[in-house]
Amino acid sequence: MAATQHSVKISTGALNLYYGSFHALRDISVDIYDRSITAIIGPSGCGKSTLLRIFNRMNDLIHGVRVEGRVLLDSASIYEKNTDVTALRKRVGMVFQRPNVFPMSIYDNLVIGPKHQGVKRPQELNAIVEVSLQQVALWEELKDILKKPALDLSPGQQQRLCIARALAVKPEVILMDESCSALDPESTMKIEDLMVELAKQYTIIIVTHNMEQARRISDWAAFIMIDQDKVGTLVEYAPTTHMFANPQDQRTEDYITGRFG
């Protein structure tokens, strides 16, 4: 897709991450733009998912993780001691590789977040459910079976439900970690179409091994690979059309053309 330059939503500078003494990411500096899709690409083990999880501090859940450098959301640091991490994760939602619906009804999956934020009136909750499902094109399919277990849905429906659950708390950014890799081609196409539509309102950052997917739907692409010290580094960051048509680094060209990966 052609990149349209919006305002910067997330910015990193001299960003490093360590797992104990292991240096996982080195000196990552990127500006991620609002209302766009940014694809993080690179070989397995280079730190793509680690970088993605920095943006809503999911790495905090791993013992021994240390982050150095600058990570800004709307120009405000998200790694201050007084950062409200719960509020951050409301603003920056996440959808994982495999559908992780909760073992409860479709309806309860969607209202659990809003209820946690204090929404109690049934009318408000019902409206949130309808709007969230409409956003992921599931309302017509599910409106008559909302009390059925979410686990009864197909994998593709479950993944769209997970996206709807993230949308129910009104995020600004949506992180998607290989969110189509466990789905069949038809479900993948629906999720891709959904991402393009959602990018009109939200900032979307995806991790993908699928170069054709990155080429099809992303506006910007960040290519990461490990260096000679086995540390993940940013090789190239550019509008996707530019990177795929005219990569500026030989390693980028070798990766996107399938010479390694």
Regions found by a protein language model. Name each.
Residues I41-P43:
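The feature captures the beta-strand-to-loop junction immediately N-terminal to the Walker
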Residues K170:
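Conserved catalytic motifs of ABC-family nucleotide-binding domains
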Residues N56, Y107-H116, N126, E130, ...:
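Short helical segment in ABC ATPase nucleotide-binding domains corresponding to the A-loop/adjacent helical element
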Residues I174-D177:
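Catalytic Walker B motif of ABC-type/P-loop ATPase nucleotide-binding domains
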Residues R70-S77, P122-D144:
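Conserved ABC ATPase "signature" region
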Residues K148-L153, Q157:
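Conserved ABC ATPase signature
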Residues I226-T257:
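Conserved beta-strand-loop-alpha-helix hinge in the C-terminal portion
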